[in-house]
């Protein structure tokens, strides 16, 4: 009897909360619709897999940080382009005043539709972010970068003035305000951040990010991006090999890594990543310098195979779909089509296995080699 009275009292409290704060203000978790997490894909299949859900989650705070020229803005611009291709609206808060529109166009960004703001100080930037997020009309908002969100007092003060903790307090207040609005409007906020070094650290890494600790706590995903190798065509540098580590992940298991190529003037090489993962998971066969897919030759050398996939986007999409289906990432359950005789246990084991780092690519093949045509 006591249990029944308690249940009635709880139901009455829930009803009162809904009347006062609106429907959905409180509910039992079993009553929530079980929908897959909506994502914005990156240009790297390996990173989508490492994130565990097929891309950057919607309605969350995401932090991307790393050393200078490591690919932070490039990775973010690819996410911007993919959000726009899906019909979304995107805003870019360029606090560094360094966005190159021509480079953004090369990565697929629709610069005519991109909402751009170049604020004068940190308070203005975060106030603009808050107003845009609360409009509910954005799919993605990018803040580049946290280090450039300089408080108004610091800008208006003298060069030698001390402003300890101002930026950290500014970030903490802003994140408290916008986090709930981001979730309700399904808007993703990507904060690009820089690295600094703590003085006097004897043990452990001295590296830290700017803006205090608030962003570390509020971020659902934190990605550490590093340049690990220079890609060369003979003696000419043509790009970088980049490694991303998911150091925090609230939507999937963390600490997974992904490697991909960033080519100068082109951005992330999606096709190069598909070749690496296709070979790793057995969809693309590598025999000597030749790459083949289901008996069709893609080309001699990775560069020719990459160009072949770039010229045949349907084939590239097919390879990507098979990789994601095998790993159970970024594919709706109803879209999965199990092949006869497939080893379900093996597929499940592959889905649970952490994403392995792809070894650095070999040097480009001789320029005289040509990609073979696919079978008609």
From Swiss-Prot:
S-S bonds: none
GO biological process: DNA recombination; DNA repair; SOS response
Compositional bias annotation for Low complexity: 338-376
Keywords: ATP-binding, Cytoplasm, DNA damage, DNA recombination, DNA repair, DNA-binding, Nucleotide-binding, SOS response
GO CC, alphabetical: cytosol
Pfam families: RecA, RecA_C
Domain of life: Bacteria
Region (Disordered): 329-376
Binding positions for ATP per the UniProt entry: 66-73
SMART domains in UniProt: AAA
Principal subcellular localisation of the protein: cytoplasm
Record's subcellular location: Cytoplasm
InterPro entries cross-referenced by the UniProt entry: AAA+_ATPase (IPR003593), DNA_recomb/repair_RecA (IPR013765), DNA_recomb/repair_RecA_CS (IPR020584), P-loop_NTPase (IPR027417), RecA-like_C (IPR049261), RecA-like_N (IPR049428), RecA_ATP-bd (IPR020588), RecA_C_sf (IPR023400)
Record HAMAP family: RecA
Protein name: Protein RecA
Highest classification ranks of the organism: Bacteria, Bacillati, Actinomycetota, Actinomycetes, Kitasatosporales
């Amino acid at each position: 009897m006591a249990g029944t009275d308690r249940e009635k009292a709880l139901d009455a409290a829930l009803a009162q909360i809904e009347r006062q704060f609106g429907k959905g203000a409180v509910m039992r978790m079993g009553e929530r619709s079980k929908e897959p997490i909506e994502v914005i894909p990156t240009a790297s299949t390996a990173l989508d897999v490492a994130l565990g859900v097929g891309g950057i989650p919607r309605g969350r705070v995401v932090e991307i940080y790393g050393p200078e020229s490591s690919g932070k803005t490039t990775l973010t611009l690819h996410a911007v382009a993919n959000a726009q291709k899906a019909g979304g609206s995107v805003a870019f808060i360029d606090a560094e005043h360094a966005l190159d529109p021509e480079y953004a166009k090369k990565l697929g960004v629709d610069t005519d539709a991109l909402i751009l703001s170049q604020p004068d100080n940190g308070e203005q930037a975060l106030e603009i972010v808050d107003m845009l997020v609360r409009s509910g009309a954005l799919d993605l908002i990018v803040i580049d970068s946290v280090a450039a969100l300089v408080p108004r007092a610091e800008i208006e003060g003298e060069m030698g003035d001390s402003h300890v903790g101002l930026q950290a307090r500014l970030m903490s207040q802003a994140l408290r305000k916008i986090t709930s609005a981001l979730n309700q409007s399904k808007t993703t906020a990507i904060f690009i951040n820089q690295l600094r070094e703590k003085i006097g650290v004897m043990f452990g890494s001295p590296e830290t990010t700017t803006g205090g600790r608030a962003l570390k706590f509020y971020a659902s995903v934190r990605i550490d991006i590093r340049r690990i190798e220079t890609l060369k065509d003979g003696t000419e540098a043509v790009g970088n090999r980049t490694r991303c580590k998911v150091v925090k992940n609230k939507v999937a298991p963390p600490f997974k890594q992904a490697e991909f190529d960033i080519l100068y003037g082109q951005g992330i090489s999606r096709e190069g990543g598909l070749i690496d993962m296709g070979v790793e998971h057995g969809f693309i066969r590598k025999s000597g310098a030749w790459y083949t897919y289901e008996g069709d030759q893609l080309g001699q050398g990775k560069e020719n195979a990459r160009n072949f996939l770039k010229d045949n986007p349907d084939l590239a999409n097919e390879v990507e779909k098979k990789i994601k289906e095998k790993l159970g990432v970024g594919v709706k359950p109803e879209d999965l089509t199990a092949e006869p005789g497939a080893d379900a246990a093996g597929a499940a084991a592959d889905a649970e296995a952490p994403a392995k780092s792809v070894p650095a690519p070999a040097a480009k093949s001789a320029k005289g080699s040509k990609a073979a045509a696919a079978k008609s």
